[in-house]
């Protein structure tokens, strides 16, 4: 008997078959470099930088940029940004540079070149007859890389948000040490013609490379990061949210996870903390793994760890945090149950407020305060643990312990208390809710409750 088969009848005929489904070719892939080779891309023939500058600038002015030419120019222009490595720099076993080495962004990666010439057309006309200066190259590189950031801004941002960002970026790249090379609003006009450039692998790779370089190397032109900073921890919103969460509640990751009372967290926690990743290594390739092409589908995204993501942002909503109210709910990951757990944890960690004296006039006053606090603690421990409880609350020794919180949820039948619902309604009703956001979910789910 084949354990994989099922047997049934169709029109009195016995059928035996093996049910098979499509294999997901797009599974989560952990970023790791196993062959000790730097991340790499292949571009066309290296250009003459003066000719390339004039061509790309004319394309920027005419809103007609050739992505292959732009990538070829950005890679060639890396030579202008030499800096000194402050410490030995290694990642995934690769020595990137030694302390004191002179390096440029292309020291971090391998850029292979073919013999294929670029177009280097002058689409927008060109008055510049002299050769460009280094500040002009730096300004052009900065503006081009900013197209990456602009293309990552979602359409959910209302009003003139994107235009305002583009204008501020232009101001940066017309102020020393940079120099004005385009007219006002050029960046936004050009962006509309290449709004999806964040999906071009080579462009994304170069943006990540520049960002990884400038995030570590002190440099005159470090402000170029304004356009590339979104490549850091890209598609890691689940892991980044968890990191922010444990900082807020002032617990270790291990302590925080003890409060995650739901079976669906198990797979996600295992996924987030896969051994062998350089999640905690400063300046690792891990930080830019998505842009450097080290993973096709991030195991750290909000979709990959949706229950964790939902819980964290429901706690954030309870606190009235705008970022959480604006975040997008992962609808397939038990948002109703996560909102219940989020209410209890929100109340435990933030709702009561923790006020205590932290600063003193002198050491004597500090010691007197600590002695008085110890006496108070001893008295509390000597108490039998019974408390005059409001709102049917349940206390057991340490009221914030995972056991105590879990017991309170069970005593309330796995439902929110009225005080939780009032809090959720008050924070979400005062907020202009974006489509599919946590604020909208809370409004729709709880605003009709008494």
UniProtKB/Swiss-Prot annotation:
**Cysteines paired by S-S bonds:** none
Q: Which Gene3D superfamilies match?
A: Nucleoprotein, Rhabdovirus nucleocapsid protein like domain
Q: Name one GO cellular component term.
A: helical viral capsid
Q: What does the UniProt keyword field contain?
A: Capsid protein, Helical capsid protein, Host cytoplasm, Phosphoprotein, Ribonucleoprotein, RNA-binding, Superantigen, Viral nucleoprotein, Virion
Question: What is noted besides the main data?
Answer: Displays a superantigen activity in human and mouse, activating mostly V-beta-8 subtypes of T-cell receptor.
Assigned protein family: Belongs to the lyssavirus nucleocapsid protein family.
Protein name as it appears in the record: Nucleoprotein
Q: Which organism is it from?
A: Rabies virus (isolate Fox/Ontario/1991)
């Amino acid at each position: 008997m084949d354990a994989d088969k099922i047997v049934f009848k169709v029109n009195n005929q016995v059928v035996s078959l093996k049910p098979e489904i499509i294999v997901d070719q797009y599974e989560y892939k952990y970023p790791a470099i196993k062959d000790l080779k730097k991340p790499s891309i292949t571009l066309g023939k290296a250009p003459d930088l003066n000719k390339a500058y004039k061509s790309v600038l004319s394309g920027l002015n005419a809103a007609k940029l050739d992505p292959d030419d732009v990538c070829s120019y950005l890679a060639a222009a890396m030579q202008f940004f030499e800096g000194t490595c402050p410490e030995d720099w290694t990642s995934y076993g690769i020595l990137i540079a030694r302390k004191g080495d002179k390096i440029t962004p292309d020291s971090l990666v391998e850029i292979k070149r073919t013999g294929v010439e670029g177009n280097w057309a002058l689409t927008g006309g060109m008055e510049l007859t002299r050769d460009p200066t280094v500040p002009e190259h730096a300004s052009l590189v900065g503006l081009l890389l900013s197209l990456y950031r602009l293309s990552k801004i979602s359409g959910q941002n209302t009003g003139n948000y994107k235009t305002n960002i583009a204008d501020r970026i232009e101001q940066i790249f017309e102020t020393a040490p940079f120099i004005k090379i385009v007219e006002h609003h050029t960046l936004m006009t050009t962006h509309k013609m290449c709004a999806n450039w964040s999906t071009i692998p080579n462009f994304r790779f170069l943006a990540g490379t520049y960002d990884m370089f400038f995030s570590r190397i002190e440099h005159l032109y470090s402000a170029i990061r304004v356009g590339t900073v979104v490549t850091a921890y890209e598609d890691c919103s689940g892991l980044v949210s968890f990191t922010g969460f444990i900082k807020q509640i002032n617990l270790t990751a291990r302590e925080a996870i003890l409060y995650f009372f739901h079976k669906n967290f198990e797979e996600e926690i295992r996924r987030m903390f896969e051994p062998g990743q350089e999640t905690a290594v400063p300046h690792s390739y891990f930080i830019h793994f998505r842009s450097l092409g080290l993973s096709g589908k991030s195991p750290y995204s909000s979709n990959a760890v949706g229950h964790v993501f939902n819980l964290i942002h429901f706690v954030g909503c309870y606190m009235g945090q705008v970022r959480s109210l604006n975040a997008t709910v992962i609808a397939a990951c038990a948002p109703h149950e996560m909102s219940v757990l989020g209410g209890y944890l929100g109340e435990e960690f933030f709702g009561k407020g923790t006020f205590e004296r932290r600063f003193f006039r002198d050491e004597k006053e500090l010691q007197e305060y600590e002695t008085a606090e110890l006496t108070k603690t001893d008295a509390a421990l000597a108490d039998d643990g019974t408390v005059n409880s409001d709102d049917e609350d349940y206390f057991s020794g340490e009221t914030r312990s995972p056991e105590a919180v879990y017991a309170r949820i069970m005593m309330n039948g796995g439902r929110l208390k009225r005080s939780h619902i009032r809090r959720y309604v008050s924070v979400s009703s005062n907020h202009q809710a974006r489509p599919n956001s946590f604020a909208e979910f809370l409004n729709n789910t709880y605003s009709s409750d008494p």
